[in-house]
Amino acid sequence: MAEEIVVEPESLREIEHIVLVLSGKGGVGKSSVTTQLGMALACRGLKVGILDIDLTGPSLPRMVGMEGKSVLQGPRGWIPVDVPTGMEQGCLRVMSLGFLLDDRGDSVVWRGPKKTAMIKQFISDVYWGALDYLLIDTPPGTSDEHISIAEELRGARPDGAIIVSTPQKVAVADVKKEINFCRKVNFKLLGVVENMSGFVCPHCSECTNIFARGGGESLALESGVPFLGTVPIDPAFVEMIESQSSREEPLISLYKTSGLYPIFARIVQHVLDQGIPSRCQ
């Protein structure tokens, strides 16, 4: 039987590193984590892209303040939307189904084959140009969509996956399934981020545990996966996202002054310290 030839999509050939962001269930803040990972990398002067493949809940346009922007069609495919950074070096580009919908309230009611076709098109038909990092925001859970993503990326040799959890036991149980999925499809586990770990008071900035704490860290240790850090709920970050359209200063410039930026700078450093070689070597 002839061996199947796996070809890397041409659209990904100028990208040094590809990282998937996964979660075992919805509502854990995966898209927020993906956005902040992208901004923290861009703050280092790196060229970053974010591909939003969460087809039924495409929230990245709103997260980066680019709602209403249009995706252009170029000779080499769709051209992602550039997010203003206010920096001389680095960039942040975003592609999402949200840019293709007429209204944020439009629902995406598609059967599996149509979702699979859209995932394939997003991976193979978006022209990113040269990037240091491409972050892929995936749907929650494990489904046919995840299998399609894994199949489309086989020839691309992604760096691996970051898994987002919250401290509660029900979320941690779902993360175990995500870890098993990654191992079955040969995605390297770059680490676990425990999101919503505490609440930052908007008045005194004290962080208080409102859920259990340490569930993600314990699971990472138990599973032999790096633990990248804990992220609290910060109302100031939510306010920054919601009010950015009325401000002239670029989102990334605002983000560098937020209390969450140092946390994500450390998380990014933990990933970089793993020393994963460039795909382009």
Swiss-Prot record:
ATP binds at G24, K25, G26, G27, V28, G29, K30, S31. Keywords: 4Fe-4S, ATP-binding, Cytoplasm, Iron, Iron-sulfur, Metal-binding, Nucleotide-binding. Heterotetramer of 2 NBP35 and 2 CFD1 chains. One of its GO terms (biological process) is iron-sulfur cluster assembly. Belongs to the Mrp/NBP35 ATP-binding proteins family. NUBP2/CFD1 subfamily. CDD domains: Mrp_NBP35 (cd02037). The keyword Nucleotide-binding applies. Component of the cytosolic iron-sulfur (Fe/S) protein assembly (CIA) machinery. Required for maturation of extramitochondrial Fe-S proteins. The NBP35-CFD1 heterotetramer forms a Fe-S scaffold complex, mediating the de novo assembly of an Fe-S cluster and its transfer to target apoproteins. Required for biogenesis and export of both ribosomal subunits, which may reflect a role in assembly of the Fe/S clusters in RLI1, a protein which performs rRNA processing and ribosome export. Its cofactor is [4Fe-4S] cluster. Transmembrane segments: none annotated. GO terms for cellular component: cytosol. Its main location: cytoplasm. [4Fe-4S] cluster binds at C201, C204. It holds the Pfam family ParA. This is Cytosolic Fe-S cluster assembly factor CFD1. GO terms for molecular function: 4 iron, 4 sulfur cluster binding; ATP binding; ATP-dependent FeS chaperone activity; iron-sulfur cluster binding; metal ion binding. It is found in: Cytoplasm. Binds 4 [4Fe-4S] clusters per heterotetramer. Contains two stable clusters in the N-termini of NBP35 and two labile, bridging clusters between subunits of the NBP35-CFD1 heterotetramer.
